[in-house]
Amino acid sequence: MGVPDCLALPLLVTFLLLSLGLPVLGAPPRLICDSRVLERYILEAKEAENITMGCAEGPRFNENFTVPDTKVNFYAWKTMGVEEQAVEVWQGLSLLFEAILQAQAVLANSSQPSEMLQLHVDKAISGLRSLTSLLRALGAQKEAISPPDTTQVIPLRRFTVDTFCKLFRIYSNFLRGKLKLYTGEACRRGDR
């Protein structure tokens, strides 16, 4: 039993736009508040981490890639305003996206790229684009704007990675940590 022809094209276009990270009319505006949605991206990130853990001494990058620190000081996080949390999440997503694009370039320039690594890098890029779109629909601002009641936002802590294993571990930890904490709080505040 298939999808009627009159619905097939709109569904296909919707899935295409979502995979590109573009907003889709008719998409539930708070889809990220459904825990199953975020868990799907976390699961994909964890799979990529698990695949690359077996090759800890696998391909190294020619240069180190900058990624966000994923450690969370829960006391400091709880005292931050949701706007400050949003800034930290956007900065982290931006660093991750840039690092994963650099990893994609490493694979593209490799003489024998691993199809499995390429698949997980492509999924990570698609996932980050979709998460960006879902966060915009939640009302999170992409621009790292300092909240009006603070004079300055503490810059996001960063460090560097030199392997796919470390990159995917950071990606997985960031989604399970800061992103999940932020969306949980933003969704709760939006329900009030």
From Swiss-Prot:
Family: Belongs to the EPO/TPO family.
SUPFAM superfamilies referenced in this protein's UniProt entry, alphabetically: 4-helical cytokines (SSF47266)
UniProt source species: Spalax golani (Golan Heights blind mole rat)
Alphabetically ordered keywords of this record: Disulfide bond, Erythrocyte maturation, Glycoprotein, Hormone, Secreted, Signal
Gene that encodes the chain: EPO
Organism superkingdom: Eukaryota
Residues annotated as glycosylated: N50, N64, N109
Name this polypeptide is given: Erythropoietin
Function: Hormone involved in the regulation of erythrocyte proliferation and differentiation and the maintenance of a physiological level of circulating erythrocyte mass. Binds to EPOR leading to EPOR dimerization and JAK2 activation thereby activating specific downstream effectors, including STAT1 and STAT3.
Listed InterPro entries: 4_helix_cytokine-like_core, EPO/TPO_CS, EPO_TPO, Erythroptn
Pfam families: EPO_TPO (PF00758)
GO cellular component, one term: extracellular space
Keyword Phosphoprotein: no
GO biological process, one term: positive regulation of cell population proliferation
Compartmental location: Secreted
Signal peptide stretch: 1-26
S-S bonds: C33-C187
GO molecular function: cytokine activity; erythropoietin receptor binding; hormone activity; protein kinase activator activity
